[in-house]
Amino acid sequence: MMTPQHILMVIRLASNPHAQLFWAWIALCLALALHVADEASTGFLSVYNPTVMALRKSRPWLPFPVFTFKVWLAGLVIAVVLLLCLSVFVWRGARWMRPIGYGFAVIMLANGLGHILGTIFGRTVASIRFPRPMPGFYSSPFLLLASAYLLCEL
């Protein structure tokens, strides 16, 4: 049964001018969570860590770290939780969230494209080849769609 509190909540949801941006933000956060699960279950670090090591040989100034599985997964889970916590500010229409939103969307767009291109080419750098599809490939379309959605709403 709908209580008056439920009705008021629905009215607030429908009348918020930032609701579309909020849902776009949530969609990208959930797409990222799905992507993390995809990468974790398909062995992403078996491609990422050797790629970083190969890049360090030719470009030692690149600051990419090598990860253990636990540290990598914990860091990404914390990042997803923090991004979801920021959704409160998106809901409220905080102007300072716009640049963060653009950065988040562009990085996730590049991430999704990177996994798709990695799958097409079967490698990250010349010396690092892997069986197709690249780990994280299956969730990449969700990253692309959610990134585009957020960019359109920004």
PLM features: what roles do these ranges have?
Residues 21-25, 96-104:
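Membrane-interfacial loop-to-transmembrane alpha-helix junctions, especially the N-terminal start
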Residues 70-87, 138-144:
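Core segments of transmembrane alpha-helices
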